[in-house]
Amino acid sequence: MKDLSDAELATLLDKDIFHKISAAADKLQMECYVVGGYVRDLFLERPSNDIDVVVVGSGIKVADELKNLLGSKAHISIFRNFGTAQVKYKGVEVEFVGARKESYNRGSRKPIVEDGTLEDDQNRRDFTINALAVCLNKDRFGELVDPFGGVDDLWDGIIRTP
């Protein structure tokens, strides 16, 4: 395990798939972040082909634009009921979701789901180490967003909720 600067994260994300996601999000003028386990695994120096992307806006639109940029070798699955999409390309799976926030009515365990910000989406994550996000937009490519101290928790071996 090692600490990673934003520049080092940008270097680790210097792959065609991330640059294409960046181009798709920038074209649609939407903020876009790789989140969760993929980011955690970068710090742990573990390889992963399972990428989760949060879009402040429509994850489905960014996934569709990515498919257009990647061409016929990419396969897209859209799950409108859940507001998600998955793009498979050269052995890599990228899951897209729009940032959302959840609230609950008294006496109900069923969440009320609304569009949200990156912070809203990070707040609903299970653990701080899975709330880590790295920006993919060109102007902030590689910038870590860690509002809950997830990197410190990772180093300290602590599992806690945001």
Model-assigned labels for residue ranges:
Residues 1-162:
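Catalytic cores of the polymerase beta-like nucleotidyltransferase superfamily
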